[in-house]
Amino acid sequence: MIVTRSWLNEWIDISTISTDKLVKTLNSIGLEVDSISSYEVPQKIVFGRVLECKKHPDADKLNICQVDIGVSTRQIVCGASNVRAGLDVVVATIGAVMPDGTIIKPVTLRGIESEGMICSAKEIGLADINSGIIEIDSSIGKYKIGEEVSQNHLFSDDIIEVELTANRGDCLSIRGVARDLSAAFDKPLRERKIQEDEDKRVGIGRILSLSHENNLGVNIRYKAVDFKNLTLPFIVRLRLSQLDDKKESDVESLMLYATHSSGVILRAYDYALFCAKDETMAKISLCRDKNGFASVMTKDKKVSIVGVMQEELFKVAHSNGVVLIEATYIPPDVISKKMQENKIPAGISYYRASRGSEPDLNQGLDYCISVIEDNSESSVYGGTIEIDEPHEDKIISLNKKEIDEIVGANIDKAKITKILKNLGFDTTKSLADNFVIIVPKFRHDIVNKQDIVEEIVRLVGIDNIPSKPFTFTETNSFSSDYYDYKKRVTYRHKAAFSGFFESVHFVFDEKKVLQEYGFEILDESKELLNPIVNTLDTLRSTLLCGLLRATSNNINNGYSSVKLFEVGSVFNSQREESLKMALIFSGDREAESLANTGKPAKVDFALFVQKVSNVIGEFELREYKTKHTLSHPYQCAEIFIKEVSVGEIFRLHPNVEQKYDLDVTYMCELNFNKLPNDLKTAKQSSKYQASFRDLSIVMPQEMAYEKIKNVIDASSTKELVRFYVVDKYSDKSLGENMSLSIRFVLQSFDKTLEEEEITNAMNTILEALKNQLGVGIR
């Protein structure tokens, strides 16, 4: 948003306020100044008046002018096409140093002496406003011939660019910024009202009729002007050039100027286009179009969409004749929602309408009409034709205590009331310390009591609020989400430390492959409607297929040993999500080296089990048949941790290994949510020596070790610390039996165990095995 000091001064008196203070104030009230630039016309450049103008005898494009510069009359040769007698101009006198460094000196042009230069805007350091010299008019205020141009506020000004947030549409105008400054400086906002003498003017109702649908949710107002010899004044041309935005016609430029100044969205229409043939009554209808937008129509043609765009055909391209001036307002939330639903092309007015334009339509119309009447012989039709739909007031209630608690400081009630009043809030219904606040229509961003307090803090100034230490009691900041995240990171790190590389896949898989191997698939009603590709046409119910493909790709790329893992989401037939972890080990058990003479052995079940144990800790394996067909029928087991089933481990079926060009391959899939995540707790250890004893027992080959383990665990031998298998043996002499060697570790917390105590403990275990399972020592 671009503003200038002189333009702001039209709406609020800042003549005694320095630019530095103005900028600091804008920043302090939340209107952040993005940049500031100043310009001042050099010395010895004065106002002049062309007394006489005649053609140069030896040059068609040059004119010889007699120019009054106050102290004397100077002869100046000028080549501008718009120079003429009676014109007030800007003259660079002898000795003036121009912005580009040129020094004005007496010269002779085609035999004619010239003492000075009649200047264009660009030549004195202003923005380029036209192709000729500056034409001075009354719009710049009072001036005297011969007076230094730099003494006029328009020729010595500051241009300030303010960076606005999207919710501050109320400051997308000079008047809007001035309104905030009036509250900050406690100065009144200047209003521009037109005193119409209705009896002397032709009523607009004689030339315009308006019909409309009900409940359109827009406010719209029309004025009619019969333009005669409209010429944009210098001040308008200069300011539009500073905005770097000028329209092709003077009328369109004037609408842009008045909109930027007042904040009201203004449009101009060619009156003749609204009249039927041989009729003088223009007819406008306002209705919703097929997309639900409030649209201006005439003769079944769309003229414009309120707050969005205007058809080029109905724009004004001339400066004479009757023109309809339209002022509109539509709530920003309404127009923004409509535009999100219907992606239609938008004009420049949408930017302002979607952020919140000025709802006081008279402000824009009065400002525009005053510029027209001051700078042309145009006549304005009396009255307006309008649709004025009421918009519900936003009322916010809060009390003094709430304000103080949010701010963290005690602010005087009278000061609060004054700030809110200066900002346009109505507090007349407030009682005692209870504020009942009616939000002004132009403040679309105010929706709750926190917004009200923010307005108070803006005007008080954050630097003027004393700092207070924040007192609080530290609580446990770790949530279940953190522990879930920590668990996932921990297991991923353990897998990486064990030599596995992480593999990451989409949560999609190929339905045909899942069905082929007997995995669960989505119910038909839950399937994907628009798959990315045919090979990713469903949600995965297992991580195994993805790891299998990744391993095959690595083997095909020349790797002889592949170890991968993945932690990710899977879905059951009802699209219910769960988390799983899977690991795969394929090919050589280790890299080629001198130790294995370059011929490493293949991975086996025991090695893979040990690798998985390094990741998830100790576990038991129990006999198990998988529900899918990826598994080898005789090399698969169920994994238990503390009597809880957490997953399965198996060798890949030889047919599947062959299909994917894999060597010996083992896989494991775990229910991640069932994996332990307990904090490690310290256990007391005995200071006395431990004793080791080995027992070799004869047992049937088909007997599960689990039975042996359960009997030993239940033997109630308190000295037994742990036990584990160290060897197994079978030969013909044992027949259908085998020998299993188990090592026992015995230890007491009270003393060093004596031989008799150790023997009694081992006998207790042997007796339990014999009585319950019928097995004994070899």
Swiss-Prot record:
Cofactor(s) the protein needs: Mg(2+)
Localization: Cytoplasm
One GO CC annotation: phenylalanine-tRNA ligase complex
UniProt keyword annotations, A-Z: Aminoacyl-tRNA synthetase, ATP-binding, Cytoplasm, Ligase, Magnesium, Metal-binding, Nucleotide-binding, Protein biosynthesis, RNA-binding, tRNA-binding
Disulfide bonds: none
Binding site for Mg(2+): D445, D451, E454, E455
Cofactor: record remark: Binds 2 magnesium ions per tetramer.
PROSITE patterns: B5 (PS51483), FDX_ACB (PS51447), TRBD (PS50886)
Boundaries of every B5 domain copy: 391-467
Biological processes annotated in GO: phenylalanyl-tRNA aminoacylation
Enzyme Commission number(s) of this protein: 6.1.1.20
Family recorded in the similarity comment: Belongs to the phenylalanyl-tRNA synthetase beta subunit family. Type 1 subfamily.
Assembly, per entry: Tetramer of two alpha and two beta subunits.
Protein name in the entry: Phenylalanine--tRNA ligase beta subunit
Source taxonomy: Bacteria, Pseudomonadati, Campylobacterota, Epsilonproteobacteria, Campylobacterales
Name of encoding gene: pheT
